[in-house]
Amino acid sequence: MIKANKNVEHIKELWRRWSDARKDWEDDARDDVDFYLGNHFSEAERDELESRNQSSVPLDRLYSAIEQFKAIITSKPPKFSAVPREDSDSKLANVWKTILEYVWDISDGNETFKQVIHDYTVTGLGYFYAYVDREADYGRGEVKFTYIDPFRVVIDPNARNRWFDDATGMMLSTIFTKFQLLDLYPQLSEVNEENGKMLIDEIEGYREDETYPSPRNARTKGSYTPDVVKDYDHGEGSEKYQLIEYFSKIKVPYYRIANLQSGDERILDKANMDKMMENDEFKDLANQGLVDIVEVQQTRIKLTCTLGQIVLYEYILNTDKYPIVPVPNIWTNTPYPMSDVRKNKDFQRYLNKVMSLITSHAQASSGLKLLLPQGSVDDIEELERDWANPNATIEYDPSFGEPHFPSPQPLSNSVMSLPQMIEHYIDLNMGIFEMQQGNAEAAPRTSSATMMMEDFGQRRSKSKLRDVEGSLKRLGKVIYNLAKEHYTYQKTFRVVQPNNDMSEYMVNFYDDKSSAIGEMFNDLTIGQYDVGVVGNSTMPSNRWGEWSIYMEAYQSGLIDQTEALMKTDIFDKEGVLQRMDIVQQLQQQLQQAQE
């Protein structure tokens, strides 16, 4: 067995401490997941309903509200912006904007974004994870991002920043089988000549429960979560191993070099500074006092990856922000935010209880109880059998008295209106309304009023979107930092726009157009940009309303036909514009010939 690394023991101890600290949040979040999946009742509640001959199927208003909220927030992909800090860098802003869109496309950004919003809504916390895929592009690598299940991430419980910037560290746990690890790291299949074992066989396995918590409610629906299927495979190679990626902050030296003659300033890391010190010309300038050198300490993120008792690898990421970007929902100034499901669970339980009472009353009304005087019927069981036969003749002794049917009291109209009121409160808390779901009865009579109401109805969703856009902006900054260090070779970025136009830029290619781009990737002082997200870019828009506005502007002469045509759903916009140009040219030629 390989000897344990001291650093690994420290990381495992932190994992245990931070996991224990979030145990209460984990239980509540798992209960939220159960509610989303339709498992609203505990085992005792389900058994009680079955004893009453009532179904344990809830009237699940919460699910539809969550799905509608997700549809509104993720209607369209976000639009990134890159604002240069200096006027000289303005020509490269579109390059960075294209790179961010390119990374979004190759990372399946639309699907990933929707899953993050799902976790954000259900558990209260979603995660983006930016990384470099070393195998992509035939080994040249690509900067990508994905989503992370919130149960796989543990955070320093002392963090108070919304994006956990003040946390001493973050940990990402992944449970692999033996075969999965060998696929990812073939080096682990190498045989130790001393004992004849593969390296992976000398690594400690993982014998604890999955990082995904177990349910607390009865599984009334056919939902198969990771805690359910974790033991389905018992064959060869199914042994479990825990891989922990530990992200921590360290200080890295950088050097700010100023040329006192020209006023130019550059910033170099230690490796480039050592190369610069070997330059004789630079040494002469430094000896003459013409160069000012200042060492500064900058925060960078260190990644330490452990497997069992060994350190698999570790390196420093050229970013001052954690590559794991949280998307907290109802912020509580801790790493344990609340979710929309948790905020509305009591309303859903109330709705289930009201429906149970209504169902119980319906059962009592449809199956009337029969009260018989004692001794008037000889065989009660025979009476119960004959009672179900509409043509049966039943004998009884009237001297004991007449049979009696006690009728239940009718339900009040206020009770019957309770479900609608509860559904309204759930929609109100989620910031969605029936009109936004296509309910014609809740819509105004005119189209203009409907569009205005739809716009007003999205204000709650837009408020929550502001918080989500903050996390998207943070993700863009991390991608910017990783891409700036990674894309140091010649590469072409192509992105197809929604109007079928193609944006194409080549980096690290020296010609009149993009010679400065290569300098941007090699020099940290050139090309500093502030990455942002265009507000409301992911929200749905009313295309009929937009088209009417553009048509009015076109008819008023405020815009040309090209701008108006780009807002339509016509597929071949470029072809239409080309044919219109040809027609106009022919008309001009005909007019000139007639003159």
List PLM regions with ranges:
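Extended alpha-helical, oligomerization-prone segments that build pores/tubes and scaffolds
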Residues: 1-595
